[in-house]
């Protein structure tokens, strides 16, 4: 009995509740976190069309205090037929069909409390199963950059980049032309 009280006191001092998050609670918490995350993706990153979740999993649950958790999530997204201006729920929209439909793999850290669900960080990059080729360029947004402004603006762009260079053609990656690397010797290229 003394051991249990000491263990509970230790867990409380380390800001852990010591109480497990049960599977049913985890599922509803993860669903709520995924909805908030997809709202952020569609508000900040999507072009003309909405994106929808294709797959998802919880990588890790980090307890921060009593009823406060950080969920580390992995999920995939793909563009749908619904226009962003339609106001439709993305989960009710059909996926676009085609060879070059944008898709991405994302990771997110979402803080869930009893009152609030907040995206702490979000990172999406070209999906490995996507048909687009070339080098990959990931985009990352941190908590202070994810605040959606009430005026409906898309939010701040990373310093040094314009929105056009970050998200050309409504895709999460851009094609980069390879630059010739000088050889460093005096022999010229006779094939030019």
Curated annotation (Swiss-Prot):
Cellular component, GO annotation: extracellular region
Q: Which Pfam families match?
A: Spp-24
Annotated S-S bridges: 82-93, 106-124
User: Could you tell me which residues belong to the region Disordered?
Assistant: 124-192
Q: Where is the composition biased (Low complexity)?
A: 128-137
Instruction: Give a yes or no for keyword Phosphoprotein in this entry.
Output: yes
Q: Show the InterPro entries listed in the entry.
A: Cystatin_sf (IPR046350), Spp-24 (IPR010892)
Q: Name one GO biological process term.
A: bone remodeling
Localisation per UniProt entry: Secreted
Write the signal peptide boundaries.
Answer: 1-18
Q: Which UniProt keywords apply?
A: Disulfide bond, Phosphoprotein, Secreted, Signal
PTMs? Multiply phosphorylated at serine residues.
- Membership in a protein family: Belongs to the SPP2 family.
Q: According to its UniProt entry, what is the function of this protein? A: Could coordinate an aspect of bone turnover.
Name of protein: Secreted phosphoprotein 24
| Protein source organism | Oncorhynchus mykiss
Q: Which lineage do the record's taxonomy fields give for this organism?
A: Eukaryota, Metazoa, Chordata, Craniata, Vertebrata
């Amino acid at each position: 009995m003394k051991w249990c009280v000491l263990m509970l006191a230790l867990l409380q001092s380390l800001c852990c509740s010591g109480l497990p998050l049960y599977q049913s609670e985890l599922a509803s918490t993860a669903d709520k976190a995924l909805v908030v995350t997809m709202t952020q993706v569609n508000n900040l990153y999507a072009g003309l069309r909405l994106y929808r979740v294709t797959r998802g999993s919880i990588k890790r649950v980090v307890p921060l205090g009593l009823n406060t958790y950080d969920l580390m999530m992995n999920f995939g997204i793909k563009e749908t037929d619904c226009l962003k201006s339609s106001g439709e729920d993305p989960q009710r929209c059909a996926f676009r069909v085609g060879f070059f439909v944008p898709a991405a793999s994302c990771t997110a850290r979402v803080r869930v409390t009893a009152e609030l669900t907040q995206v702490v960080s979000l990172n999406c990059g070209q999906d490995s199963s996507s048909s687009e080729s070339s080098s990959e360029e990931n985009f990352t947004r941190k908590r202070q950059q994810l605040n959606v402004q009430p005026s409906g603006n898309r939010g701040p762009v990373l310093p040094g980049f314009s929105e056009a260079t970050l998200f050309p053609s409504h895709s999460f990656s851009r094609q980069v032309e390879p630059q010739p690397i000088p050889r460093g010797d005096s022999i010229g290229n006779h094939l030019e």
